[in-house]
Each structure stands twice: as C-alpha cells, then as structure tokens.
A protein has these predicted regions:
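Rossmann-like AdoMet
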Residues: 1-153, 171, 314, 328, ...
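Generic recognition of stable, solvent-exposed alpha-helical segments in well-folded globular domains
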Residues: 6, 23-26, 58, 62, ...
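A residue-level signal for conserved active-site and pocket-lining positions in enzyme catalytic cores
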Residues: 31, 157, 295
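Short, well-ordered beta-to-alpha junction loops that form the rim of enzyme active sites
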Residues: 93, 162, 246-250
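A short, conserved alpha-helix within the catalytic core of class I
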Residues: 146-150, 163-179, 223-233
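A mobile, often basic/glycine-rich helix-loop segment
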Residues: 158-211, 258-268
C-alpha cells in the first residue's frame, strides 16, 4: 500500500509551518479531508463489502426505511412539528445513499403526506457534494445542499457515523509527573512519528487521587473538540424537533478502563485495522470512539432535552414494534430484509457497539426521556 507523495509533502509542510510538529487532529484533518487527496475525498467506494469498512447504511435500504418511519411518525408528530413542513438535515452524507433510502421510503409510505418532508444535506466538500447530487438527481428540488448548518431547523438533524470521523487529539498519561501530555506528529527518519507537545491538559480531565496512583504510564486517551463543537452548533440551530446521531462510542468513564490503555483510535483498510496509525495517510480510515458524555453535555447546555441514549439494537427494535401498528405502511419482510435487520441489531454486528444519542426541543412523543 502506497500513499500519495503529494499528500505526504503537504503534511510535512504543515509540520514545518507548525515549528516541527502538528497535533494529531491537524494530521488527521489533512490525511482524511485534504481536497482530492484525503481518504474521504478520493472515492465514494470506501464503504461496503468491497471497501474498507461496513456501515448500517451499506447493509441495505432497511436502515433508511426504519429511520424514515421514525422521522414521519415520531419527529413529525413531536411538539411544534405536527403541522406544516418538516426539514430533514443530514450531515456526513458521504455518497448520499442514506438520503436516497430515507427519501424513497417517505415517498412510498407517506404518499402525498410525504411532501411535507424536505431534505437538506450539509456538505462542505465539493467532491462529496458532486457524488451526492449524482445519486439524488431524480428527487429534484426536494433535496438541497448547503456548506454549513442552517441557522434555524424545524425537523430533524441526523448523522450516521459522523462524529467518529472528526479529527481527535491524543493524550498520554505521564505517571511520574501525574499529568496528561498531548502527543503530536513530526517527521523523523523518513516517516511520521509521535512527539510530545507543550499543550496544557484539559481542565475537565483532572483525575481523582486514587486513579492517578494506578493509571499506568503511557495510558492513551483521545478527545475531539471538533465533534463536540459540531454538536453544539447543531443543537443551537434546532428550533423544533430532534438532533440524533448513530455511532460507536463510550461514556467518559469507560475510556479509562484497562482494556483501552492504547486509546480507541484505529486505522482501517479492507476491513482490517492497523496498529501503525501514521504510516499510510490518505489510504486508511482513521476513526476513534465518540465521547457521548461530552457530546450530550453540550446539547443539554443548549437547552435540548434527552430523547434517546441507548443501543442501536433497542432503538431499531422500538421502531420495528411501531411499524406493526401500521399495517401496509411498511414493506413486507423478505428473507433478505430479515437478515438485514439481524445485522443491524445483532450483538456481533451493529447491535452492541453502536449507540443512539437523540436530544430534542420538546419531549419525545413515544414516551422516552
């Protein structure tokens, strides 16, 4: 596996400009999102069986159909949205497949009522926006694009595996000094390597005395200020409805367990992960677990109320149970669709490690809080 020499030179230039090192977050920003060269910018064909990783969307259309039913029957009936148009705002849409599945399900299941739902994709990348426009062309003006989150949203802001794709900082515990030290990236002996940065540790990471004495030297923890900031902006934009993400992640205290001493950041290629995180910029996916505690906190600070905070399996089963009360409004269950649902909910697939975090302006009409 060879990486782009142009991308390597751009990262090296950033390191030189930064005084000899950059944060891991800056390295990831270039390796993943540099126009035409970054991992997420090169091709839409990185997801699925023939790509580097699978997602709930790549399992098939069922995931989008279930979300469409939930949007119509829960979000569309929530406080402030029971009448009038409902906007669906998706961020991190990649090639637009989830949007396609959701829109097709809404048009098929809602009939004329489906016209109250309009779809917006927030996409800052011109490359990815072109992929999405090609896939969604047949929906015409029912789909619109913007580079940034709109100032006011009445409906649902949703994402699937978006927050885990934000760049992260990497911090190591210095047991002798009893403090966190940020690790950055520099160029050494013709390769990228780790180096300590003189960055003050986050104040919220002050550890209790009993944990300071047992946390092993070199214990790694990541944080993603950009993911938390994105959630805060989305929460501020939500005027009525729900802000929801489906992703893999942990609560704050779970990051400090013995099994995660090397952190959660992984490099993926062809459904395998690599321990060497810095060797193949632009050729591998770099992803870390979401800190749901930090994300949820900024939503609450913005005035949102809890809707869901549960495993993806339970959330989808709840939607499935609701579809049984609406005969004829959901497609019949073929063998293929049953297998897809099992993949989405089984503990060995997407059921255990993936979680749903949803917060809203107003209570959840299905009685969840």
């Amino acid at each position: 596996m060879e990486c782009s020499p142009i991308l390597v030179e751009r990262i090296r230039a950033a390191i030189e400009t930064g005084g000899g090192a950059v944060s891991l977050a800056r390295y990831m920003e270039l390796a993943l999102y540099e126009p035409d060269l970054g991992y997420y910018e090169r091709t839409p064909r990185i997801v699925g069986r023939r790509g580097d990783f699978a997602t709930s969307v790549s399992v098939g259309s069922l995931f989008g159909e279930l979300m469409a039913y939930w949007i119509e029957h829960e979000v569309g009936a929530s406080e402030g949205l029971s009448d009038g148009p409902v906007e669906i705002v998706e961020a991190g849409a990649h090639d637009g497949r989830w949007a396609e599945d959701i829109l097709e399900a809404l048009m098929r299941g809602s009939g004329k009522d489906g016209e109250r739902f309009c779809y917006r994709i927030v996409e800052p990348s011109a490359t990815r926006q072109a992929w999405q426009r090609e896939r969604l062309a047949r929906f015409g003006d029912r789909v619109v694009w913007s580079e940034a989150m709109p100032a006011r949203v009445r409906g649902v802001i949703l994402s699937n595996e978006l927050l885990d794709a934000f760049p992260v900082e990497r911090w190591c515990w210095n047991a002798t000094q009893r403090r966190w030290v940020e690790q950055g990236v520099y160029w050494k002996e013709e390769k990228f390597d780790w180096i300590a940065l003189p960055t003050p540790a986050p104040l919220e990471w002050n550890l209790p005395e009993e944990l300071q004495s047992v946390l092993p030297n070199g214990f790694v923890r990541e944080r993603s200020p950009s993911a938390v900031a994105w959630w805060a902006r989305a929460a501020a934009a939500l005027h009525a409805g729900c802000l929801i993400t489906l992703d893999y992640g942990l609560e704050a205290e779970e990051f400090l367990t013995p099994g995660r001493s090397a952190g959660t950041l992984r490099a993926y290629h062809r459904h395998r992960f690599f321990d060497d995180l810095l060797s193949f910029p632009g050729e591998v996916d770099l992803t870390a677990h979401v800190d749901f505690s930090a994300v949820a906190e900024v939503g609450l600070q913005a005035g949102l109320v809890p809707w869901y905070r549960e495993r993806q399996s339970r959330f989808l089963m709840r939607i499935l149970e609701s579809t049984q009360r609406s005969p004829g409004r959901f497609p019949d269950w073929s063998t293929q669709r049953v297998r897809a649902f099992q993949t989405l909910t089984h503990p060995e697939h997407f059921g255990r490690g993936f979680w749903v975090l949803a917060q809203g302006r107003g209570g959840a009409p299905w009685g969840r809080a």
